């Protein structure tokens, strides 16, 4: 609305394909841009200067600061410029494994940039104008669908089994202790996610 530039491609790098037929998109970024989203990711919430792999899989040896990648990978993020307070959303409509480089790589020949690279499919990008993060989330969920509110009985605690197999010993006892604790603390709707 105010004439601010929300997005620019990098000339000569914008859309390309490498020798392994992976398709890439390069976007201009600024030093004071912040990047939020990407689905389930560990580490700092602002992913500026981070490299992220997007592939569902078990994260054995999980580290809350650095583990990548986790199960829920969503090729959507919001770029927020700290100076202008302008935000824009990027949704890459592709379910293939991919990765994002959010300015970690710097070159002398081009303006600062981020890259999206997909192992299969096309670069099918939806740019979602702000100006606010709230506006972008509203428009993104208009596009992808909104979650319905679950009944109260379904809003209990859901535990993950990722922690228990990595215990040095007595992992079965730890699971049973967790269940006992939830009963003692009157935590309803206990569920657990795991793999055999």
What would you call each of these model-derived segments?
Residues 76, 194-195:
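Active-site and adjacent substrate-binding regions of carbohydrate-active enzymes
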Residues 1-167, 171-174, 179-184:
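Catalytic and substrate-binding clefts that recognize carbohydrates or anionic sugar/phosphate headgroups
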Residues 189-191:
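Reverse-transcribing Pol proteins
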């Amino acid at each position: 609305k105010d004439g601010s530039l929300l997005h620019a491609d990098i000339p000569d790098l914008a859309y390309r394909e490498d020798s392994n037929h992976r398709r890439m998109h390069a976007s201009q970024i600024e030093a004071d841009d912040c990047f939020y989203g990407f689905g389930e990711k560990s580490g700092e919430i602002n992913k500026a200067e981070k490299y992220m792999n997007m592939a569902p899989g078990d994260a054995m040896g999980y580290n809350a600061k650095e583990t990548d990648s986790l199960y829920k990978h969503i090729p959507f993020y919001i770029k927020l410029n700290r100076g202008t307070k302008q935000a824009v959303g990027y949704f890459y409509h592709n379910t293939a494994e991919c990765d994002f480089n959010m300015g970690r790589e710097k070159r002398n020949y081009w303006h600062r940039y981020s890259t999206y690279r997909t192992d299969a499919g096309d670069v099918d990008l939806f740019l979602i104008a702000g100006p606010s993060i709230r506006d972008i989330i509203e428009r993104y969920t208009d596009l992808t669908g909104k979650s319905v509110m679950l009944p109260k009985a379904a809003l209990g605690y859901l535990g993950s089994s990722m922690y228990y197999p990595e215990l040095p010993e007595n992992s079965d006892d730890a699971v049973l202790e967790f269940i006992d604790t939830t009963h003692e603390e009157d935590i309803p709707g206990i569920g657990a996610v795991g793999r055999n």
